[in-house]
Amino acid sequence: MVDRLLAFDPGGRGIAHFFVPGGAARAALALRHAKRVLLTTGFSIGPGLPETDGPPGTASLGRALRALGAEVMYITDAASLPPLQAALEVLGEPTRILTFHADGDAALTARRLLAEHAPTHLVSIERPGRARGGDYLSMRGESVGEWNAALDELFLQAPRRMVTVGVGDGGNEIGMGVLRARLARAGARVSKVASIVPARHVVVAGVSNWGAYGIVVELARLSKRPLLHTAEDERRMVRACVGAGAVDGITRKREATVDALPLEAHAGMVELLRLVQDSTPHGGKTR
């Protein structure tokens, strides 16, 4: 049932060409007993224009992992830090956020951060991954490299033993590199922007936030604990992200929408996912 919800493609992006059945379930299995998780998010489509997609999903998944005993850290760039912090604050989560600076040697910075914080798992939710030509591209095929730090270097520099998870909805995000053959068949537009940065586990959804929520539901089913946030939390997170400077990644408007879908569409998706979660016997319901 989680797959059916994540495969819903209201934006008509054609994710059926590269949807990965069971992706959320496999990611949850890999994350269930994680010790130290470093999560990244943030996709800026212009100067000072971070998206509303990504931070809510990251905050929700981070909260779930922390509830299961993991040490959770976050990393993003300066532009996307305020929306991520805002989403975490809505859920009452600690805001331990590292900032990845765009200047200098990104590969060296990534190796230093990995050595210093020693995560066992790396998770990216709606974060741009470089395309074949080395640039970072929006779904419109426009370069966004100037406004997004090279956080994909964390995945490129990660040792093989480290578990990596990538969540995306357009093919141009970190992790989608393992789907290059499928993305090539999805059409010229998707093929052009497709990321070459791989992850061991990939989750594709109609909206990246939903992909993260799908992992949370699968974690809830595995642990028999209610972990997903509420529809009201969803509304508050998106509004808080906008208040912190985020915009809709498609309309580019500073309003409480995500990927051109109204707030109630996202609240409704959370309600549906909570129904799936609550169909598994556990000790109670999330607040």
State each model region's role:
Residues 43-45, 127-130, 170-171:
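Short glycine-rich anion-binding loops that position phosphate/pyrophosphate groups of nucleotides
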Residues 1-36:
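Positively charged, low-complexity intrinsically disordered leader regions
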Residues 86-156:
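An acidic, phosphate/nucleotide-engaging active-site surface
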Residues 173-287:
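C-terminal functional extensions of proteins
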Residues 70-79:
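Short internal beta-strands
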Residues 69-70, 158-164, 172:
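A short helix->loop->beta-strand "cap" motif at the edges of active sites that frequently abuts
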Residues 82-87, 165-168, 172-184:
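Glycine-rich, charge-decorated loop segments at or immediately adjacent to ligand/cofactor-binding or catalytic sites
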Residues 51-71:
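Histidine-anchored nucleotide/phosphate-binding helix
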